[in-house]
Regions:
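Extracellular and analogous surface-interaction loops
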Residues: 51, 204, 293-296, 301-314, ...
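Boundary at the C-terminal end of the N-terminal hydrophobic targeting segment
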Residues: 20-24
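Extended carbohydrate-recognition surfaces in non-catalytic/accessory domains of CAZymes
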Residues: 231-310, 399-426
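Aromatic- and carboxylate-enriched substrate-binding clefts and catalytic-loop regions
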Residues: 64, 347-349, 366-371, 460-597
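Solvent-exposed beta-strand/loop surfaces of large extracellular or lumenal domains
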Residues: 69-85, 288, 328-349, 529-534
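A low-complexity, Ser/Thr/Gly/Pro-enriched, surface-exposed linker/loop concept
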Residues: 25, 29, 48-93, 133
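Bacterial N-terminal signal peptides that target proteins for export
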Residues: 1-8
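Catalytic and substrate-binding clefts that recognize carbohydrates or anionic sugar/phosphate headgroups
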Residues: 88-241, 255, 314-318, 323, ...
Length: 597
């Protein structure tokens, strides 16, 4: 009798076109929306499933009464018509395609994905699989243009998606990071764009599925909480055993010594000196290093003891420039590392620390620059079971929005990713050859001489790259070759092509505020102004900012300016564009909140 009833419900549902209301859900085309029967604290009120294809199901969840209208910046329009079956069994809504099943509990909202042999591919945790917290953008993060931000855009939701994961599962993806980690199972990673960091909200599993979440916010993989200062995670003791802080010893290149207490190691950023908002709201960073101490050529040691509140493998994050070594409990846990002072890096490591034991710690730092950076923080301890879950956190979004992509193998999963994000153009064959690039070539003569030398030496080069600063010193953003160094760009391009080479050029979304292109973009409201207000000058000594690449009109104007000055002007002789500085980065090594402003 139950089987007959289920088949009858399925048949009725399959006959539906749009707008059908069933007992627990509403169906409109390929969308099925469920108003949850049990609203949990911090949980969603509605969940919407979209069958994109046989192997792709989209999951949206909101804590609001309805879903907001939004246009994705990463998902291309999906016009495929997937065939699928919908049925209800008790509290469960079941969607079956030709490749998989998705089962959602209409009471709790928990979703489980299966293959057609009833093997679990992925399932959300039963309680807390989808959680929300209201989020309002702090005024200082909206910066000088706060008056232009509509009230509705100041408010959204922080959300976390949490899934069970078996011990033998591995995760790969998240973009390109300097973490020296491949399998991200049990690891933490902050997702944002930076000079040496490319973040992609997508992972694949060795269980042959992938998850792509549609969020452009600051995100965290793994631990959803920020790392703690050492004094928030441990009891600290100085090198003599006195409780409260570590001992910091600073010795400059002349042997002059400063010894002081350190309750945290957090010298990770610098503040723009003329920034009113920085001076009012942030007194941290490298300004808390000893006043008047010359870092370059110095040696710094932080030492003492930490006492942990519980036994755990503690996950640390080291932020460093210059030379760095760390010992914990007498063991070298971070062998010597180096990073150029103007562009620090993060390095993650974990080590066991016993509860209630004064464990020695020693941090050795050689700053190797007039300005340099150092920080050591630690994640609050979590159980191994918690670490091994698949956890995604997004700081601010209108809703939770992710795509589950199934496949028989990882190639099929990547194919699903390409279905969602659009097919990548196939590069011409010459791009598969060797590319030659320097920090920059400084003249057309450099370009032509180097290309000829490669040919004379029979070294196969297909592409030579012109990096930054081919413009006049004070004209960043002009997209114009400086005539004194590039007297005839057309002849340079023709020469490279005559040697059967190709030419690639770096173009930046950055403009000095004195150039014509800046003024044209600014007249339409398409330039960011915080760096201008704060009078930030780059390392060459000039003031500038970045344009608003989120505006369709701004992007069209940006391309027109490139086209007029570099492409059409030189008979389409430029073969490839290096769209540099996708961060954007108005100044190196500022705190996260200021980068947002």
């Amino acid at each position: 009798m139950r089987l007959t009833k289920t088949l009858l419900i399925s048949a009725v549902l399959l006959m539906s076109a749009t707008g059908m209301q069933a007992a627990g859900f509403n169906q409109n085309g390929n969308y099925l929306t469920v108003q949850l029967k049990q609203h949990q604290n911090f949980g969603p009120s509605q969940i919407r499933l979209q069958v994109v294809s046989d192997k792709i199901i989209r999951v949206q969840a909101t804590a609001e009464q309805s879903f907001r209208n939004k246009q994705s910046l990463i998902i291309v329009p999906q016009n495929s018509k997937a065939n699928y079956k919908v049925e209800e069994q008790g509290d469960n809504l079941i969607i079956t395609t030709a490749a998989m099943r998705a089962v959602m509990n209409e009471a709790t909202g928990q979703i489980t994905f299966y293959d057609l042999k009833d093997n679990v591919l992925l399932n959300e945790v039963a309680q807390g699989g989808k959680t929300f917290k209201p989020f309002t953008v702090p005024d200082r993060e909206m910066g000088v243009d706060i008056a232009k931000v509509p009230e509705a855009q100041k408010h959204g939701w922080s959300w976390r998606a949490l899934f069970n994961s078996p011990d033998n599962e591995a995760f790969y993806g998240l973009g390109q990071h300097q973490s020296e980690e491949l399998n991200m199972k049990g690891k933490n990673e902050d997702l944002f764009q930076y000079n040496t960091k490319v973040s992609v909200p997508f992972v694949i599993s060795n269980k042959n599925y992938g998850i792509l979440w549609d969020s452009y916010s600051y995100c965290r993989w793994g631990n959803p909480e920020d790392y703690l200062q050492l004094n928030r995670a441990f009891k600290l003791y100085d090198k003599d055993g006195k409780e409260g802080q570590l001992t910091g010893t600073y010795v400059d290149k002349n042997g002059q010594k400063i010894v002081r207490g350190e309750d945290s190691i957090y010298f990770e950023y610098a503040m723009p000196e003329a920034s009113e908002i920085c001076n009012k709201t942030d007194n941290g960073g490298i300004q808390n290093l000893p006043k008047g101490f010359a870092l370059n050529g110095s040696k710094v040691v932080y030492e003492g003891y930490v006492e942990a509140p519980t036994n755990s493998f503690y996950q640390f994050i080291l932020y460093y420039a210059g030379y760095m070594k760390i010992y914990i409990d007498g063991k070298l846990v971070v062998p010597e590392r180096w990073r150029t002072a103007w562009n620090p890096n993060s390095y993650k490591f974990e080590t066991p620390i016993k509860k209630g034991v004064k464990t020695p710690i020693r941090i050795e730092w050689q700053p190797d620059g007039d300005v340099s950076y150092c920080g050591l923080r630690v994640a609050a301890p979590r159980s191994e079971a918690e670490k091994n879950q698949l956890s995604i956190w997004s700081e601010m979004s209108p809703d939770m929005d992710y795509y589950f992509i199934a496949g028989q193998n990882l190639d099929e999963v990547i194919s699903g990713y390409r279905t969602l994000t659009g097919k990548a153009s196939l590069y011409p064959k010459w791009t598969l050859g060797f590319w030659q690039s320097r920090e920059r070539y400084q003249s057309s003569k450099d370009i032509e001489d180097n290309m000829k030398k490669f040919r004379d030496l029979h070294i196969p080069v297909d592409n030579i790259v012109q990096d930054w600063n081919y413009w006049k010193l004070d004209s960043w953003g002009s997209h114009e070759f400086e005539a004194a160094r590039y007297p005839n760009p057309q002849a340079m391009l023709d020469s490279v092509h005559a040697m059967n080479g190709r030419f690639m050029i770096s173009v930046w979304p950055k403009f000095y505020d004195t150039v014509k292109n800046y003024k044209e973009l600014d007249s339409k409201g398409w330039m960011y102004h915080q760096a201008i207000k704060d009078d930030i000058h780059d390392w060459l000594g000039f003031r500038g900012s970045f344009y608003d690449a989120y505006s369709d009109g701004a992007r069209k104007m940006f391309w027109r300016q490139m086209d007029e000055n570099l492409y059409t002007k030189y008979k389409f002789g430029i073969d490839a564009w290096w769209m540099d500085a996708s961060e954007p980065n108005v100044r190196d090594c500022t705190p996260m909140w200021y980068r947002k402003a």
